């Protein structure tokens, strides 16, 4: 009977931490400038209007507005942020 564990036991037994990737803000949501829209590896989603791309391919909003998912081509999706039309304050006629 062996009194030592097999060599495989010391090489296994670890796992990497999850990177919490994915879509963080969905279509129709109101975002502030600087909000992260998507964390990704590679460019599954491409930056559209008013969206910046970080060095790790993270997409983020450049302005305050509403998120919209669009297709660049049949196979390429882009994410844009469009400004919300501001309502003017109602004036009281008097």
From Swiss-Prot:
PROSITE patterns: RIBOSOMAL_L27 (PS00831). Residues 1-25 are annotated as: Disordered. It comes from Gloeothece citriformis (strain PCC 7424) (Cyanothece sp. (strain PCC 7424)). This is Large ribosomal subunit protein bL27. One of its GO terms (cellular component) is cytosolic large ribosomal subunit. One of its GO terms (biological process) is translation. HAMAP family: Ribosomal_bL27. InterPro entries: Ribosomal_bL27, Ribosomal_bL27_CS. Keywords: Ribonucleoprotein, Ribosomal protein. The gene is rpmA.
């Amino acid at each position: 009977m062996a009194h030592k564990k097999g060599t495989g036991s010391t090489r296994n037994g670890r796992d990497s931490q999850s990177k919490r990737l994915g879509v963080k803000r969905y279509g129709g949501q109101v975002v502030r400038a600087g909000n992260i829209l998507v964390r990704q590896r590679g460019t599954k989603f491409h930056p559209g209007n008013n969206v910046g791309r970080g060095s790790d391919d993270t997409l983020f909003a450049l302005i305050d507005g509403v998120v919209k998912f669009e297709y660049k081509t049949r196979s390429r999706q882009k994410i844009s942020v469009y400004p919300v039309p501001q309502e003017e304050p109602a004036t009281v006629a008097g």
